[in-house]
Amino acid sequence: ESRPGDVRDAATLAAACEGIDTVFHVAAVPGIWGPWSRFYSINTRGTENVVWACRQQRVGRLVLTSSPSVVYDGRPHINADESLPYPETFLCHYPHTKMLAERAVLRACDDRLLTVALRPHLIWGPRDNHLIPRLIQRARSGRLRQVGDGSNEISMSYVENAAAAHLQAADALQPGAACCGQAYFINEPQPVKLWGWINELLALAGLPPVRKRISAAAAWKIGAVLETVYDLLRLESEPPMTRFLAAQLSQSHSYNI
């Protein structure tokens, strides 16, 4: 049964949660650019509405799809674990509002509503309409550049494995279980070199490898300038480079599971 709705509408969520014992909260607005109000109203307030709806309908278990970016502090993460604290500042609204959402879900955990948050990193696989299409589109238009020296390693999450982790997390949510009220990184055991993976993907699409390069420092500076310009001119479109994007494309992000 499908019930379309908006996470900003608490009443709709309550109706959808009626008679349900487990909720998987996956909905969010992704992206590296846009007004704070949009990210906050959906990612944070929407999640708070989900928690409220679960309590109203006496749902027993809530699994949140979070993100490793909630603990991203601007520095590389190499074999990082869940001891990483939330940073005090964020480079864009998405990780900030997702952090607030994750914190709300974990704080809500009690004997009536058991909660857990999963942080899958770079989900990819069949029916992807976000990551892979954007990479291929940029490559075909000649706008894809390697940022940094290409040595950065990242943890990835195949979509079916990420889905399985959510089901396993729900099963593990039992009274007194160690996972209750906790957050966990979710990814494949071995990291890969980001730009090597991108070039393999492009080859499968019949495209040449990325040859144009830009240093991480230059990309960061360009991103900072573009963010300022887009802010001043109130441009709604996404800048081709931001500080967050420069860091994500040039730094290692690997996690110990």
Model-identified regions with their sequence ranges:
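Substrate-positioning beta->alpha
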Residues: 96, 100-101, 129-134, 148-172, ...
